[in-house]
Curated annotation (Swiss-Prot):
Matching HAMAP family: G6P_isomerase
Pfam families noted in UniProt: PGI (PF00342)
Active site: 355 (proton donor), 386, 514
The keyword Hydrolase belongs to this UniProt entry's keyword annotation: no
Protein's name according to its UniProt entry: Glucose-6-phosphate isomerase
Subcellular location: Cytoplasm
NCBIfam families, alphabetized: PRK00179.1
Gene Ontology CC: one annotated term: cytosol
Pathway: Carbohydrate biosynthesis; gluconeogenesis; Carbohydrate degradation; glycolysis; D-glyceraldehyde 3-phosphate and glycerone phosphate from D-glucose: step 2/4
CDD domains from the UniProt entry: SIS_PGI_1 (cd05015), SIS_PGI_2 (cd05016)
Length: 549
């Protein structure tokens, strides 16, 4: 994987000139000048997903120049490096192989001279056996009752991914009730424990090292709560399992290491739902549906690794994102799923993107002088329309948006889905084409009103349009299509990081706050005034101590 400053390439210089030509061209003009624009700027994946990127401020020349940038920064080489098991996470000396976890073709993937697939398959088989015992009721709690509730205790990648997927696949769920606890705020675990019965609850403690502060604090609180009823510590083994590699700490906690599900250092946290971290997904929707999720992701992996860049969906979306972020100065991207089950999708890729590409140091160790990762945010439609779409339509910020919707709903209730999708289609049209002053005035005339008498209102009803969007229309949200969609975004993130010459798979930015919190924690143990920090931090700590007394 080469270290190439993208701004020093001839393609970047060409894109700068091209931007000067494109900055005042409107999406409306692009459509008016090309009746085949949709056909040229859209593509389908496996007849399950249509990606329409025609409502963007791009031409074929734009894409060609962006593809030149990908070539000059050796994106193809970076893709090969990842899939071949090269240690592309150089700051931690690790391979990056979440693709191995869903390698359904089972072709060998070599890390340090060893094929990782036998171990991957062994853990999958172990999860299958365990989950079937829980789901069938064969596994009994300490009083002989079957498990009814599962509580996943994790944070970051050990929480966001499984929670997002179990919500997205709720139509496929079985009888088990799923709960997720992440925040070290005691309120989170306390509220979940109010809902469950210690006799019928299984806790999954998801921490690779079994030392994560938030996770272990919650796990010990759950254990204490459980033992208040169960009494004997030997019963912990019937109600706790671990997603970890620290067998010693797992055993000391009271968990049978036979119920410890391992994963590897080449699995990054925010790419770990495909690993043992996905056990909560299996317990929610069953092993077969989890395999379908893996299969969908594997299909997208094959598309990404074998399809020419000009037709490669993750690459195309990544390049368009770089175009807006670095040339138009767009700082954010909104992910807007028109499906209530997908309500955690934007939050999941907020972590996926911002923790991956939120870096200001390039792979050479130098501060960059260009934009790297964007701010990611979003909410389900149509809720967002009544919240923040005002700014997207008429604000002063450019916010490129991804609209996502299924053609087939899991809940065909009356005409709800037609109304939902009518909004999905309408919003991208409105954002692209807007509404001119002439149209506003004509609407007044059609209503029998004199525009001249409403001159003071007319400017406020004008929509400039020219707001870029991608539309991702799925046939239906199934385990397979969801797996493919997640992998699409994962590879988009990787592509941008590779081109922008940053390390996508470390996250040193989370460490400093942890270090300082560990230093401050002992200072909160008494009522002494603190003076060892800056005046602001001292003032905050001392006021906290005064108010808690």
């Amino acid at each position: 994987m080469k270290n190439i400053n993208p701004t020093q390439t001839s393609a970047w210089q060409a894109l700068q000139k091209h931007y000067d030509e494109m900055k005042d061209v409107t999406i409306a003009e692009l459509f008016a000048n090309d009746s085949d624009r949709f056909a040229k700027f859209s593509a389908t994946f496996d007849d399950l997903m249509l990606v329409d990127f025609s409502k963007n401020r791009i031409t074929e020349e734009t894409l060609a120049k962006l593809q030149d940038l990908a070539k000059e920064t050796d994106l193809a080489g970076a893709i090969k490096s990842m899939f071949s098991g090269e240690k592309i996470n150089r700051t931690e000396d690790r391979a990056v192989l979440h693709v191995a976890l869903r390698n359904r073709s089972n072709t060998p993937i070599i890390v340090d001279g060893k094929d990782v697939m036998p171990e991957v398959n062994a853990v999958l088989e172990k999860m299958k056996t365990f989950s079937q015992a829980i789901i069938s009721g064969q596994w009994k709690g300490y009083t002989g009752k079957a498990i009814t509730d599962v509580v996943n205790i994790g944070i970051g990648g050990s929480d966001l991914g499984p929670f997002m997927v179990t919500e997205a696949l709720r139509p496929y769920k079985n009888h088990l009730n799923m709960h997720f606890v992440s925040n070290v705020d005691g309120t989170h675990i306390a509220e979940v424990l109010k809902k469950v019965n210690p006799e019928t609850t299984l806790f999954l403690v998801a921490s690779k090292t079994f030392t994560t502060q938030e996770t272990m604090t919650n796990a010990h609180s759950a254990r204490d709560w459980f033992l208040k009823t169960a009494g004997d510590e030997k019963h912990v083994a019937k109600h706790f399992a671990a997603l970890s590699t620290n067998a010693k700490a797992v055993g000391e906690f009271g968990i049978d290491t036979a119920n410890m599900f391992e994963f590897w250092d080449w699995v990054g946290g925010r790419y770990s739902l495909w690993s043992a971290i996905g056990l909560s997904i299996i317990l929610s929707v069953g092993f077969d549906n989890f395999v379908e999720l893996l299969s969908g992701a594997h299909a997208m992996d094959k598309h990404f690794s074998t399809t020419p860049a000009e037709k490669n969906l993750p690459i195309l979306l990544a390049l368009i994102g770089i175009w807006y972020n670095n040339f138009f100065g767009a700082e954010t991207e909104a992910i807007l799923p028109y499906d209530q089950y997908m309500h955690r999708f934007a939050a999941y890729f907020q972590q996926g993107n911002m923790e991956s590409n939120g870096k200001y140091v390039d792979r050479n160790g130098n501060a960059v002088d260009y934009q790297t990762g964007p701010i990611i945010w979003g909410e389900p439609g149509t809720n967002g329309q009544h919240a923040f779409y005002q700014l997207i339509h008429q604000g002063t910020k450019m916010v490129p948006c991804d609209f996502i919707a299924p053609a087939i709903t899991h809940n065909p209730l009356s005409d709800h889905h037609q109304k939902l999708l009518s909004n999905f289609f309408a919003q991208t049209e409105a954002l692209a084409f807007g509404k001119s002053r002439e149209v506003v005035e004509q609407e007044y005339r059609d209503q029998g009103k004199d525009p001249a008498q409403l001159e003071h209102v007319v400017p406020f009803k004008v929509f400039e349009g020219n707001r870029p969007t991608n539309s991702i229309l799925l046939r239906e949200i199934t385990p397979f299509s969801l797996g493919a969609l997640i992998a699409l975004y994962e590879h988009k993130i990787f592509t941008q990081g590779a081109i922008l010459n940053i390390f996508t798979f470390d996250q040193w930015g989370v460490e400093l706050g942890k270090q300082l919190a560990n230093r401050i924690l002992p200072e909160l143990g008494d009522d002494k005034a603190i003076s060892s920090h800056d005046s602001s931090t001292n003032g905050l700590i001392n006021r906290y101590k005064a108010w808690r007394a």
